[in-house]
Amino acid sequence: MGRKLHKEDENDMITIDTATEKDILEFSKNIRSMDAKEVEFVSGKPFKDHLGFLLTHVEDVRAIKCDGVLLGIGNWYQEQLDWGLYSPGVVGWMLLTNAVEDHKIEFLRWSKELVKTLLEAYPDITNVVDSRNLLHVQYLDFLGAKFFEDPFRKDLWHFIIERS
């Protein structure tokens, strides 16, 4: 049922589908520490304090899996006003588990394909990133992001990935 993006070898297949409560709970036990720190920095609350919201709104969360292994959760919204952001494109968010390391090449290929698909439908993808989460910054740079420092919060960068 989930959207599948293949590579030549179909053994490693990434899917994205509506998350279940089980996915959210599994994710909460396996979130990468750098992503948990970023959630707390951006929102002011530890990740565990967001669990109730995620479980209540599970239909708005997507689970990212490779051959059934949970790699992360995320979604995109056409517009969102959180953190003062507005975009005619989409505001995208994604948090990952440590399992993504075991599927790194396929995940990066899938990410490029997802960005391409989103940019066919929307003019850009945007959000914020903790500049100290170097792996996240490198990932966004790989996807073609441009970064802009927040004038009021040290270490918070806004990013945008635009259609070319």
Q: Where are the regions a protein language model picked out?
A:
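Short amphipathic alpha-helix that is part of the acyltransferase structural core
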Residues: 3-45
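Active-site rim helix/loop that mediates acceptor-substrate recognition in acyltransferases
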Residues: 39-60
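Conserved beta-strand in the GNAT
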Residues: 63, 68-85, 91
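Conserved acetyl-CoA binding element of GNAT-fold acetyltransferases
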Residues: 85-101, 157
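Conserved acetyl-CoA-binding loop-helix of GNAT-fold acetyltransferases
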Residues: 103-117, 138, 142
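Conserved beta-strand-loop-alpha-helix junction that forms the acyl-donor binding cleft
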Residues: 121, 125-141, 151-153
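C-terminal "cap" of GNAT-fold acetyltransferases
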Residues: 153-164
